[in-house]
Amino acid sequence: MQDQKGKIISVIGPVVDVKFPEGQLPNVYDALKVKNEYSGEELILEVEQLIGDDTARCVAMDSTDGIRRGQEVINTLEPIKVPVGDTTLGRMVNLLGKPIDEKGDVEGEEYWPIHRDPPSLNEQDTSIEILETGIKCIDLLAPFPRGGKIGFFGGAGVGKTVLVMELIRNIAKEHQGISVFAGVGERTREGNDLWLEMQETGVIDSTALVFGQMNEPPGARFRVPLTALTISEYFRDRQKKDVLLFIDNIFRFVQAGSEVSALLGRMPSAVGYQPTLASDMGQLQERITSTKDGSITSVQAIYVPADDFTDPAPATTFAHLDANINLSRRQSELGLYPAVDPLDSTSKMLDPNVVGQDHYSVAREVKEVLQRYEDLQDIIAILGIEELSEEDRQIVNRARRIQRFLTQPFFVAERFTNYSGKYVNVEDTIKGFKEILEGKHDDLPESAFYMVGTIEEAVEKAKKMNE
C-alpha cells in the first residue's frame, strides 16, 4: 500500500499541525513519523485532533527542535506500538519502548498499541481479595485490594521510594509476581538511583521500567503511564500473572496533559487544568483492574500541590483509589519507619465482611488507642505523664508499644540499617497487635518492639536485653 504522506504547516512547541491530501486524513491516535534533520533521529507525532478536512493536530513525543514547516510526514496507519513480554523485564525503556539503559534493542514477543479498551464487565473479576504485602502497618490498617488502586501521599524524603522498592521485592519473592514501574515527570536523578538500587537488591529481573522524566516534552510524559500499563496488561492477559504497577508520579501525568491542552486549542477549566481532566484520568484508571485470569494492582505516588487536597488533580485521583497511604514527616522524624501515618491512612477493604471480624476489631482498637494517645499529648507535654489517670497511663504505654511495633526492618534497606529484613504474614500481624492490646506484653521494654517482625521476636529481643 502506498504511504500516506502529509506536510508540516505549523510547529508551536510540542504541538505540530500536519496537512494531508484529500481523503488521506489519519485517525485520532495514529502515529506519524518525521525525520528530525537537526538530530538525525526519527520523531514520532501522535494525532490528537482533526481540524477541518485536511489538517491533523499532533503532539510530539520528543523535542521538536530542528523540525520545520514543509517537511514531509509519513502516516504509520496505526497507533504507537510498544514491545511487550519477558524481554522487557530487567530493562529500562522510554514511552516508545526504545531502550535507555544502553543494553541494546528490546525485541518484543509482540507489539501492542498503547491505546486499548479496558476489559469488558464480563471479563472483570468482581471477587474481593486482599493482597498481602508483608508490611505490618499496611496489612493491618490499610489492606491492599488485589487488582485495586492505592495512593501514596508524601513529601520529599519520607521514604516513598524505599516503600515502593520493598513492595516490588515482596511481590517478586513472596508472590512470584511481576512489577512494572512508570517514572512520570519526576527527577532523572531519582530514576537513576532507583535503577542502581534495583540492580543491587536483585529485584530488577522481575521488573520492567518505563521512564519519561522532567526533562522530556509533555507529550512523552503524558503517554508514559499508558506504555507501562500496556506492558502490564500483556503479563495479566497472556501470562495470567498478578502484576504490580507503580506510577511515580500521577500528578505529573495530569500536569503534562494541561501543558499541551491550551496549545491544542482547548479552553482551560478550573485552576488552568485541561477540560478533559476527568476523562484522561478515567481512561488510564479504568484499565487498571482484575480479570478472571490475572490482576493489575497499582500503587500511585501522588504529589499534592501546595498541600491542597482540593486541587483538581489530586481530587480527581481520589475518586479512583481504594486505599490511601499517608506518609508523615512526623513519623520519619521520630525514626518510625515505614513512616506510614496510622491515623491518616485508610482503605475501603478494612471492612469486617472483607478482612474478617477479628482483623477489623484489632485494627479499630489500634486506631482508637493511638488516637487517645494523640489527644493526651498536650496534657503530657504540660503536666507530665504522672498526672494522667491509671487508665490513661496504661493507654499511653500500650500506644507507645504499638507505635514501635508498627515499625519494620525492610529487606531493601538492610545495608543502611543493619537490621535483617522481615516479611510478616497477616495472621502474625493481627496476633501481635491483639496481644499488645490485651496487655500481655505490658512488662516488656518499649525498645523491644522497635524494628522487629513478629511479636515472638519482640519477646526474644526483650529476653536478650535483660541478659
Swiss-Prot record:
Q: Name one Pfam family in it.
A: ATP-synt_ab
Entry keyword Amino-acid biosynthesis: no
> EC no.?
7.1.2.2
> How would you summarize the oligomeric state and partners of this protein?
F-type ATPases have 2 components, CF(1) - the catalytic core - and CF(0) - the membrane proton channel. CF(1) has five subunits: alpha(3), beta(3), gamma(1), delta(1), epsilon(1). CF(0) has three main subunits: a(1), b(2) and c(9-12). The alpha and beta chains form an alternating ring which encloses part of the gamma chain. CF(1) is attached to CF(0) by a central stalk formed by the gamma and epsilon chains, while a peripheral stalk is formed by the delta and b chains.
User: Which PROSITE patterns would you find in this protein's record?
Assistant: ATPASE_ALPHA_BETA
What topology does it adopt in the membrane?
Answer: Peripheral membrane protein
Gene it is expressed from = atpD
Protein name as it appears in the record:
ATP synthase subunit beta
Please tell me where ATP binds in this chain.
Answer: G154, G155, A156, G157, V158, G159, K160, T161
Organism expressing this protein natively: Petrotoga mobilis (strain DSM 10674 / SJ95)
Name a GO CC annotation attached to this entry: plasma membrane
Q: What catalytic activity is recorded?
A: ATP + H2O + 4 H(+)(in) = ADP + phosphate + 5 H(+)(out)
User: What is the enzyme's class at the highest EC level?
Assistant: translocase
Q: Which UniProt keywords apply?
A: ATP synthesis, ATP-binding, Cell inner membrane, Cell membrane, CF(1), Hydrogen ion transport, Ion transport, Membrane, Nucleotide-binding, Translocase, Transport
Q: Kindly give the PANTHER family that the UniProt entry links to this protein.
A: ATP SYNTHASE, ATP SYNTHASE SUBUNIT BETA, MITOCHONDRIAL
A GO molecular-function descriptor: proton-transporting ATP synthase activity, rotational mechanism
